[in-house]
């Protein structure tokens, strides 16, 4: 299997467009199309359906996509191992991370890492918890930074605990209180970020048998807090996410006190590429000091 064909197929599948795939790979659109057509000819079935809006995966393409990702990942790892044997530090690391971690933790880690390994390329994907886990499951990310949980079926390295807090309007009766009782979420107007399914918040409320009164949902936490600022409800989040953020709201610890554990996910620490192992060690060293 030719890797150039696989890369063309993967880029087209992820971009949904031959033109965008060509831009990513620095090819022409016709060149990408020819590579994919050759791959389809070898396999004996279509991988992509061409439409007026771009390209979409066929049922067969959906089945082949994970295998193609795995093939390219192993090829990258092979090149990294060869370079490592020759004393060269090269490689590619795909990182998926929480917004709070991508904003407040990773810049320092990446800066320190790149000083020593300037030839290792880092690709950072930012998303909510379910997106991070999905990208890990699909093989799109080599390392995931998110909160822990029973649903993690990969190698998990805890790094730090983070307090859960309530985001309240300034005129809220408990804006100056020492804590915000989670029980109030049964009747308070709750604004839920993370596409309306913040897994950290939902897990916390489920622990106490609380069915929240969700009145608004947003994709981004910052959008949820802007709604809070305008008196449209309250929100819940982890403290790291609001670090350095300025908005006219009150931030109050929840009661009973709750925290989440933030850390790293890897498909396998043992079988990780040399570049990924190096980054993992840097992350542990830098973030354990937080």
Q: Can you annotate each of these PLM segments?
A:
Residues 40-57:
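A short LG(V/I)-centered, amphipathic sequence patch enriched
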Residues 128-133, 137-140, 147, 196-252:
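Hydrophobic hinge/microswitch elements
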